[in-house]
């Protein structure tokens, strides 16, 4: 016979961004708790609102499964003394298992007998295990926690109720400073306290109190209501996934409505209006069928449709205040002079250990000069790049960006266009922030891409130089994201820029404001980002590519993919082993690897030397790999017929030189001795 378990924790309003991860964590930890306690179940469903986290287990076994475990103890010769009595070692072993020496038996393993005991544990009724759910709740982790009411413990928010039900059976458990009961709280304004009748009646009991406990149902309600408004008014409403997830975690009983604002505000750049609505007010944007922004918005209230007109007016009033600010800053910022703002950046600190933003821009400008040549920019692109690098942070001192920091770069583009700069310069100023997340949008223009790379590289090198290096998960200056951005842009544009050579060039630059330090750490940091970009590629293949001599990001990623693609083929293992053997022996070569044909003693070493001399890796990575693997029979024949470590030192070094030249060329693809073929 199975049962159903409900656990609900009622709290003060949770931050929206915490709700979904906490709900997921609760479900995962409950599943682990049940598994650990040998309780089978059919399904786990989680619930959440801003004021509660809950989990329900259905089809829960009414008792633990019985447990039978065998334990191996000391050898018989240690367990028995000369008189055949059990020694202290044997007695201590069984005592530790809660058994006696009478439970001992001997079993033979590989010709020697050992003490064994079998421990049987009869499963307890589920009612005896349920109190342990309190430990599940205590184990939840949160990004921030707090104290309240003079208590010593911490939790995400003060706890008000705890409900634990096994079908209809109530458990009055203690959690923090709360006594458990079947009482739960309804909607803060529309509902009241209610008793949950059973684990299976949970949603309906709360629904009567204007609480929709299932977030999936709340989400669908919001989407359906928005689509109904769309159909009624003939408009298009952008349902942004992140905004939808945030909004559903702000309400317990959602009701969507449409508000409006004066059309005069549409003269302000669209990005300002959208930011005001989405980022600051959590409103959905409304457009006409052609995609043109309309003077309307969609909001979702935490309640029903009663007095909705008053709610709409209140939301409109709040939004207008934001739009007034935007209109004011848009008008006033156009009076500013870009060169004046750039000069003022001398007084804006980039970081107290690094210097000003203006100094950061100057270093970035010098880096763009190097990159422009390596990326093959045209003369016009190079001119645009130089201009963009000279002014690209100016908008940080505009009123608009001061009020809406999400618009940095975006407003820079608009203000530079108004000032008569070229579209390429303006676009680069916007694009230099890209990507803003791990999978974020990348720059489209070459000028923007180079500026983005240069800006990020100076940021990375500057922070590393003053010892502000990320450790563990701690990365307060988002240097991992910046490095990932550099790697992604290089890969996307397919620029054959060797990162090791580029970093060497950057460390050779001279600045008045800063000297780059910690180059080795920077290189390791960049390699770690390339490693991450290789995704699920086997670790040994990653290590082989990263250990190679080619640090062109696009080439490295392509090489890893090529190796993975053929790793299951029959020829992969012997081909890699041949090259790997060559790599291992080549390490013994001394000095400059020159080959003297006069020292050849057989046709096989001559054949390998000629094959190596004519080897030129070219084309896509898959083709280069075929070229290398094609050498496998030649390498094998060389090893079968040639004693590499010959007694004659000159002959030995000559043979090692052949292998050294081979591996030097192969290492441009990967270090094959890092690949595991076992």
Swiss-Prot record:
Keywords noted in UniProt: Aminoacyl-tRNA synthetase, ATP-binding, Cytoplasm, Ligase, Nucleotide-binding, Protein biosynthesis
Report the catalytic activity.
tRNA(Gly) + glycine + ATP = glycyl-tRNA(Gly) + AMP + diphosphate
Q: Which InterPro entries match?
A: DALR_anticod-bd, Gly-tRNA-synth_bsu, Gly-tRNA-synth_heterodimer
A single Gene Ontology biological process assigned to it is: glycyl-tRNA aminoacylation
Instruction: Supply the EC number(s).
Output: 6.1.1.14
Question: What general EC class does the enzyme of this chain belong to?
Answer: ligase
Protein localization: Cytoplasm
PANTHER family cross-referenced by the UniProt entry? GLYCINE--TRNA LIGASE, CHLOROPLASTIC_MITOCHONDRIAL 2, GLYCYL-TRNA SYNTHETASE
Question: Record's HAMAP family?
Answer: Gly_tRNA_synth_beta
Put simply, this protein is called Glycine--tRNA ligase beta subunit
Name the species this protein comes from: Streptococcus pneumoniae (strain P1031)
Q: What is the lineage of its organism?
A: Bacteria, Bacillati, Bacillota, Bacilli, Lactobacillales
């Amino acid at each position: 016979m199975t049962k159903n378990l409900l656990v609900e924790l009622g709290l003060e309003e949770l931050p929206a961004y915490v709700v979904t991860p906490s709900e997921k964590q609760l479900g995962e930890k409950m599943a682990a708790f049940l598994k650990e306690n040998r309780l089978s179940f059919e399904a786990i469903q989680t619930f959440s609102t801003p004021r509660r986290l809950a989990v329900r287990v259905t089809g829960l076994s009414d008792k633990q499964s019985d447990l039978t475990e065998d334990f191996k103890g000391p050898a018989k010769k240690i367990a028995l003394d000369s008189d055949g009595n059990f020694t202290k070692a044997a007695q201590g072993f069984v005592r530790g298992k809660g058994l006696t020496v009478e439970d001992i038996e001997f079993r033979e393993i590989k010709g020697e007998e050992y003490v064994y005991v079998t421990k049987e544990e009869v499963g307890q009724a589920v009612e005896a295990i349920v109190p342990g759910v309190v430990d599940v709740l205590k184990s939840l982790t949160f990004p921030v926690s707090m104290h309240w009411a003079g208590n010593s413990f911490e939790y995400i928010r003060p706890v008000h109720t705890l409900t634990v039900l096994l079908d209809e059976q109530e458990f009055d458990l203690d959690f923090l400073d709360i006594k458990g009961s079947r009482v739960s709280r309804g909607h803060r304004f529309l509902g009241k306290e209610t008793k949950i009748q059973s684990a299976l009646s949970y949603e309906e009991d709360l629904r009567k109190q204007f609480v929709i406990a299932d977030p999936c149902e709340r989400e669908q309600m919001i989407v359906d209501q928005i689509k109904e408004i769309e159909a009624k008014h003939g408009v298009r409403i952008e349902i942004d996934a992140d905004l939808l997830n945030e909004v559903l975690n702000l309400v317990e009983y959602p009701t969507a409505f449409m508000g409006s604002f004066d059309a005069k505000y549409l003269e302000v750049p669209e990005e300002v209006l959208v930011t005001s609505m989405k980022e600051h007010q959590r409103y959905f944007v409304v457009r006409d069928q052609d995609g043109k922004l309309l003077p309307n918005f969609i909001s979702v209230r935490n309640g029903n449709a009663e007095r909705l007109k008053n709610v709409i007016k209140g939301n409109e009033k709040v939004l207008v205040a934001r739009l007034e600010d935007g209109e004011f800053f848009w008008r006033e910022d156009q009076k500013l002079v870009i060169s004046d703002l750039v000069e003022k950046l001398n007084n804006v600190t980039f970081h107290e250990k690094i210097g000003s933003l203006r100094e950061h821009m100057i270093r970035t400008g010098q880096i763009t000069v190097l990159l422009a040549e390596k990326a093959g920019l045209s003369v016009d692109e190079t001119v645009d790049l130089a201009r963009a690098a000279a002014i690209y942070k100016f908008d940080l001192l505009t009123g608009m960006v001061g009020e809406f920091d999400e618009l940095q770069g975006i407003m820079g583009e608009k203000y530079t266009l108004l000032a008569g700069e070229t579209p390429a310069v303006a676009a680069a100023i916007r694009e230099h922030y890209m990507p803003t997340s791990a999978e974020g949008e990348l720059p489209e223009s070459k000028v923007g891409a180079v500026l983005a790379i240069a800006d990020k590289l100076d940021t990375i090198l500057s922070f590393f130089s003053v010892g502000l290096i990320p450790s563990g998960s701690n990365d307060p200056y988002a240097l991992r994201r910046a490095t990932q951005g550099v790697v992604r842009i290089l890969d996307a544009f397919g620029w054959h820029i060797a990162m090791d050579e580029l970093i060497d060039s950057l460390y050779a630059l001279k600045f008045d404001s800063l000297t780059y330090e910690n180059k080795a750490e920077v290189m390791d940091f960049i390699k770690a980002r390339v490693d991450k970009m290789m995704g699920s590629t086997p670790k040994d293949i990653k290590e082989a590519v990263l250990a190679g001599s080619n640090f062109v990001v696009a080439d490295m990623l392509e090489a890893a993919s090529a190796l993975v693609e053929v790793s299951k083929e029959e020829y992969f293992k012997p081909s890699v082993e041949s090259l790997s053997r060559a790599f291992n022996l080549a390490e013994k070569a001394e000095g400059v690897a020159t080959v003297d044909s006069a020292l050849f003693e057989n046709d096989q070493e001559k054949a390998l030397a000629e094959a190596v001399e004519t080897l030129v890796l070219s084309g896509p990575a898959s083709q280069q790999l075929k070229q290398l693997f094609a050498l496998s029979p030649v390498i094998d024949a060389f090893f079968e017929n040639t004693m590499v470590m010959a007694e004659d030192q000159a002959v030995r070094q000559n043979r090692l030189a052949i292998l050294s030249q081979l591996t030097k060329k192969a290492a441009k693809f990967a270090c094959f001795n890092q690949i595991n073929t076992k």
